[in-house]
Structures are given as C-alpha cells and as structure tokens.
Amino acid sequence: MFDLNGKTALVTGASGGIGAAIARALHAAGAVVALSGTRKEALEALAGELNGRTHILPCNLSQKDETEKLVPAAEAAMGGLDILVNNAGITRDMLFMRLKDEDWDAVINVNLTSAFRLSRAALRGMMKKRFGRIIQITSVVGVTGNPGQGNYAAAKAGMIGMSKSLAGEVASRGVTVNCVAPGFIESPMTEALTDAQKEAILRMVPAGRLGTGADVAAACVYLASAEAAYVTGQTLHVNGGMAMI
C-alpha cells in the first residue's frame, strides 16, 4: 500500500523541518522528489541524505516571477509532476491592532497566494494525464484561530476554502485536492520553550506529546497515494486530539 514508485513530487519549504520530513516520506515510498526552499545548503544536505531520485529547485515564494517558474522547472527536471505539496510558510505574529499592512501582505503572499499560483500551474499536466495530488499544509489555527496570528490564520483558512473549491472543479479528472492541518509539532521553536510552557501545551493535547514531522508526512503519503483516490476536498487534522474537528 501507499506505493509511489513512478510518481514525481514537488515539496515547497523542504529546507525546513516539516517539509524535509514530507520529502523523506514521499521519497521512501518511491517517488522522485523535487526539493524547493530558500536555503540551498539545507536542500543540498537533504538531497545528499536521500542519495538519488531528487532535484534541488531553490525558490523564494515571495517573488512572483520565481514562483511562476517553479512548476515548469519541476516538470522539466522530472518529466512531469504528479504530486504537489504546498508546505512553505512564514509567520509575522502581532496583535491585530498593531499588525502592519506589510506583515499582513507578506504572510498572505507566501502562505496563500503562492499556493494558488503553484496549484494553478500544476493543474494542466495533472488533468491531461488524469492523475494528480495537490496537498496543502495548513494549520489547526486555520480552523480555530489564534490570538496574535490573524494574518497566519487567515492564510491557512484561505488555503482550506481554496482547496475545497478547487477539489470540486477537478475531481472528475482524477485530481484530488486536500489539506493537512498540523497542531503543535516539534520544532526549534518548541525546543526553546521552558518546561512549564511545554507542560501547558501538553495539557491541551490528549495524546500527551507534541507531533513530529513524520506524523505530518505520513498523512501526506496517504493522500498522495492511489488508495486516497476517493478522498478530496478534505482537511486531515494531525494534532493529537488537541482540536477534534
């Protein structure tokens, strides 16, 4: 099950923890993986770790021109694109009354608009071959909201609404569009928390632990697979029960 041999995948934000975990999991399932991100050294290190069946495609998704070249570059490198994982994201947290226009715009641009552009670019090839998987990495806060993250929550909620709309347009052509919404995931940020802060977080999570990149990646492998062909327009929450939605 969940065999991705012969499939090609593009993962954005692959120079970060969750993106790298997703790339590893897709690669382990047999896919050829294009690794995209802003930190070329991290992408090269990941490609070296995976040791074959990878392509490095650095891209700054805040730049429209770079974003619009990414899918064609991935298709050229791999001979097509079967799986798109829009994982890249940034934060510019601030209380709403103090949130600057430029910080709102930056988060919406990278987290939502780039996902729109990449999804749109990938559709033609996917629809032609009558197979495609578009997976958006959203967040639990896109459903619940979170004080101080109005811009981030809006972008992630926008991804969910966009994906539902797109899923209805392309389902008959063998293309599925789904979201994965992580909760609290282990990261350099969570490692810097005090014990008291970690305990407060864990009290919110019935599973009693933080999630890992591998937890998120496993959901992506499922949604990318042939076994998930009848699943579209959905949001798969990976949060240890923190929000039962």
Show which residues each predicted segment covers.
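Substrate-binding pocket helix/loop in short-chain dehydrogenase/reductase
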Residues: 95-96, 100-108, 190, 201
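Conserved glycine-rich Rossmann-like NAD(P)H-binding loop of the short-chain dehydrogenase/reductase
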Residues: 29-46
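Residue(s) in the substrate-gating loop at a strand-loop-helix junction
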Residues: 139
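Active-site helix of classical SDR
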Residues: 119, 155, 163
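Alpha-helical segment proximal to the catalytic Tyr-Lys
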Residues: 124, 168-172, 229
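Short, small/polar-rich loop/turn modules that mediate ligand/substrate recognition or access, typified
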Residues: 171, 176, 231-233, 239
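Conserved glycine-rich cofactor-binding loop
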Residues: 8, 15-16
